[in-house]
Amino acid sequence: GTLPCGESCVWIPCISSVVGCSCKSKVCYKD
């Protein structure tokens, strides 16, 4: 995934994972 979700995941998981985003390099990306 290369589309940023506008969320970081340094301290907490991606809340945006509910819409298909996942944590990569401390930033949430959508696949």
UniProtKB/Swiss-Prot annotation:
Domain of life the protein comes from: Eukaryota
GO biological-process terms attached to the record: defense response
Tissue expression notes: Expressed in petioles and runners but not in leaves, petals and roots (at protein level).
PTM per Swiss-Prot/TrEMBL: This is a cyclic peptide.
Xref: Pfam families: Cyclotide
Keyword field: Disulfide bond, Knottin, Plant defense
Cystine connections: C5-C21, C9-C23, C14-C28
Protein purpose: Probably participates in a plant defense mechanism.
Domain remark text: The presence of a 'disulfide through disulfide knot' structurally defines this protein as a knottin.
UniProt similarity note: Belongs to the cyclotide family. Bracelet subfamily.
Name used for this protein in its record: Cycloviolacin-O19
UniProt organism field: Viola odorata (Sweet violet)
